[in-house]
Design a protein with these regions (language model features):
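Active-site-proximal beta-alpha core segment in soluble small-molecule metabolic enzymes
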Residues: 2-11, 15-18, 31-134
Length: 134
């Protein structure tokens, strides 16, 4: 019987740094980007990638899929803004407010519950952006 090795990806942080440098060349001066590093940096290591690019001036912050990923980035020492792209369950609201992690809100009731938690923690938390205005 033939033996097949598992497929694996070997990622060079130098290559990632190079790729971010190339992206920077293609964005307008003063423009900031959000680095999406969900799913453990798509399997390349969210912690290593976050540590590498955290200091880049054109990185506004990071986007992840879940509350767990966001909390993990905070535990790694990420201080820039973190946006969760997926659904966050109410049980995570206290941690999200405390850690200043941003959520996408899809229902008014969710905004109300987040607001209640922010008031409980005596923090300003909710910002509403009207993207329909030009």
């Amino acid at each position: 019987m033939r033996r097949y090795d598992r497929i694996k990806a070997v990622v060079s942080l130098d290559a990632i740094a190079h790729n971010f440098g190339e992206m920077k060349k293609n964005i307008a001066k003063g423009t900031k980007i959000i680095a999406v590093i969900k799913a453990d940096g798509y399997g390349h290591g969210a912690e290593a990638i976050a540590r590498l690019i955290h200091g880049y001036s054109y990185i506004w912050g990071f986007a992840v899929a879940t509350a767990e990923e966001a909390l993990q980035l905070r535990a790694f020492g990420v201080t820039k803004p973190i946006l969760i792209l997926g659904i966050v369950f109410e049980e995570y609201f206290p941690d999200m407010v405390e850690q200043e992690i941003r959520l996408t809100v899809s229902e008014y009731s969710m905004a109300e519950k987040l607001s209640e938690e922010a008031v409980r923690q005596e923090k300003q938390y909710i910002s509403i952006l009207d993207l329909t205005q030009e």
